[in-house]
Amino acid sequence: MDSNTVSSFQDILLRMSKMQLGSSSEDLNGMTTQFESLKLYRDSLGEAVMRMGDLHSLQNRNGKWREQLGQKFEEIRWLIEEVRHRLKTTENSFEQITFMQALQLLFEVEQEIRTFSFQLI
């Protein structure tokens, strides 16, 4: 796992948690929760790849891991669309920078999860 990605996640989550977007703050908390969930999922896939013989363990623990993987990609696509929408609608430069970095991070995480999953297949 790349330490820059971990610090990027922590930085963006911290920034998003400090944003006050009025009535949409509940939506933002949901996005933050999904970011955290994706980070944990990506980390668990990365650990499984590091152990390389762990595919059978992963399949036994979660017989529907491919279905779960598909759901994670759907979550990523949804988050990307949400972040893009917020980026278009906000005029606050701090929020724009944060959402641009969040978007970049989502693309990186999507690529990492895709790479990990191909190694496990």
From Swiss-Prot:
Belongs to the influenza viruses NEP family. It is found in: Virion; Host nucleus. The keyword Endoplasmic reticulum does not apply. InterPro entries: Flu_NS2. One of its GO terms (cellular component) is host cell nucleus. Average number present in a viral particle is estimated to be 130-200 molecules. This is Nuclear export protein. One of its GO terms (biological process) is exit of virus from host cell nucleus through nuclear pore. Interacts with protein M1. May interact with host nucleoporin RAB/HRB and exportin XPO1/CRM1. It comes from Influenza A virus (strain A/Wa-182). A motif (Nuclear export signal) lies at residues 12-21, 85-94. Pfam families: Flu_NS2. It comes from the Viruses. Mediates the nuclear export of encapsidated genomic RNAs (ribonucleoproteins, RNPs). Acts as an adapter between viral RNPs complexes and the nuclear export machinery of the cell. Possesses no intrinsic RNA-binding activity, but includes a C-terminal M1-binding domain. This domain is believed to allow recognition of RNPs bound to the protein M1. The keyword Transport applies. Keywords: Host nucleus, Host-virus interaction, Transport, Virion.
